[in-house]
Amino acid sequence: MLGSKFEARNRTGSAYYLSPKELKKFGYTDISRMLRAVPGVNIYEEDGYGLRPNISLRGTKAERSERISLMEDGILAAPAPYAAPAAYYFPNVARMYAIEVLKGSSQVQYGPFTTGGAVNMVSTPIPKSFQAGLRTSYGSFGTFNTYAHLGSDHKHVGYLVEYLRYQSKGFKKDEPNERTGFYRNDVVGKLRIHSDEDAEIRQALELKLGFSNEHSDESYVGLSEQDFASRPYYRYRGAQMDQLQTRHTQTALTHLIAFTGGLKVTTSAYYNYFWRNWYKLNDVRIGNQKGEKRSIEEILADPETNARYIDILTGTTDRLGEALMLRANQRSYHSRGIQTKVEYRLPFLSSYLQLEAGARYHADLEDRFQHDDSYSIEGGKMSLFRAGQPGSQSNRITTAHAFASYLLGKWS
């Protein structure tokens, strides 16, 4: 969308470009740290690794970055940008080439959240000659990151293959063997067929395929104020089964045709699929009656009144019956569309008039298929008491269809 610092500086509205040189210099794997240098961006941390960042542009709601447009290579990347915009999936920035941030009027052609802005992640381009590389780092808490790529371009055919592995043992532990870490895998492949660069009518067709997955022993359960003050990295025993599993695939086919007279047309068709199941603690029971169940929010807001629930949550009190209620928040997302952009540079007097017109049809869907399981707890160890019926909790399908278009003009 921008492509350089120069384009960002000369953009209408506010735009910022994090160049490949800057990303390479700091070597971050967390988008939260990358965006700290960008004015007008507010972020609050959640897991400490940037797996699911909460980004706000110009004061918009930060939770799950659901009020900004998240894109990869100019294509909407959130699981369901219109039907369910909460970004439980976020592209792995450790494999990105550059980051572009647009706020307010500078991003009207990207939508759907034109009030806040857009964050576009530019993936690694196909190299013009043979390139291969390997980058590895290791840090505290068994945090490991490795990235490998291989690509080249021969006459009229280019290709690129990338692999990323990102993992950590985590730092929220009650005992040494407790699982609180995560791992991520990400594979991306590109194939490009193109004409000669100096052809009278230059054309290119690029296919991009991607697959990624994640397993993280992450929990929604926090701490009471007293526990946070005394042991901020503590994790309650009632959250030991909490985990998130995800799978994501992406397909994009992009065609470019450029004429010598200054006319260029870029068209992309895309499809993204995302599946997640966040298996997490919802409620705690001290008995079988309706009034003997409390949500985690209620318990931690008033731990003194809910002392019996806290004892079960922390594992200091055994309960052999139905004690801990976990919900499998299983959801699948489908996102697809086609978009085209026409650019024309017209000489006028002693300057140029740059015209840009674009249109996009987009459709997405969220399908919820959830259930609850109940666990007992004894000696600080949880065991399954009763398995729930798949699809027995808060199921629904949400769909959205959208058409957007724009026309921009600029003197230069």
Task: Cite the ranges covered by each PLM segment.
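Transmembrane beta-barrel wall of Gram-negative outer-membrane proteins
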Residues: 131, 138-167, 175-219, 243-247, ...
